[in-house]
Amino acid sequence: MEEQGRDHKAAVAPRRAIVFVHFDPHGRFDPHVHHALACYRPLADHLVVVSNAARQLPATLAPLVDGFLPRANVGYDFAAWRDGLATLTPGAHDEVLCINDSVYGPLFDLRPALAAPRLADADLWGMVLSDQSTSRSKPRVPHVQSWFLGMRRRLLESDLWERFWRNVRPERDKRQTIERYEIGFSEAAAAAGFRIAGLYDATTAPPVTLAEVWPHLSPRHPRRSWRLLRKCRRRPHNPSELVWWRLWEAGVPYLKVGLLRVNHYGLDLGRVMADLERRTEYNLGLIHGHLRRCG
């Protein structure tokens, strides 16, 4: 573990740690990651970056970061978070956030989300509570999407916490990782009596309406439009990559990178970007630059 100095120490929320997991195909820290870390710094009294790609932390990021942990790119995010969490002092924090760089943002102030009343009593929480399974044959289990996990002291000091992270093993299969760790963590926590919650709760949200997706339909793009019509009617869906407008309205200040890079649901990406520019002050150049470089 390489300790990094800081040039300044801003006012912070008491006893909160953030473990941020980074991956980049070229081993770089993209400007949108710089932006994210600058936003997280005032919100944490301890900020650790775990990189599955870079061997060194750029000098420009050193003042923002308390610890840097380079590691091999194995085990997806949960193995990386396991290693990052192991660097924290036990019992030193009331809340730990595990966040990855699969999202652009924060697009707007994150502090209201962290203080949201609907999350106040949760032991395990996140930006999105979903019940999407890895296949239609699997049961639908409410779970916190793992790109942003918040965990509070009652859970942090439990036997479940220690047992879960001790048993995290690097998995080669992404679907198995999701089932065993993303879904499995929430399922085990709920079964043990811990409360789980999401700022946007897809498990209680109404179905996607035709009126909501209508602006994304176009006779000029019939195949994309048909894909959107077909997929938006399925339940459950991935709320982070389909109903991004609902997430913003719920106070979730993020946009999934995969929504723009893959566009699984067939959204009008030009409209997404226009809406982003209209609703937020986020620098769209960060998104355009990242997509040009990484595709």
Q: Across the structure, where does each feature detected by a protein language model lie?
A:
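ER/Golgi luminal nucleotide-sugar-dependent glycosyltransferases, focusing on the catalytic module
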Residues: 1-295
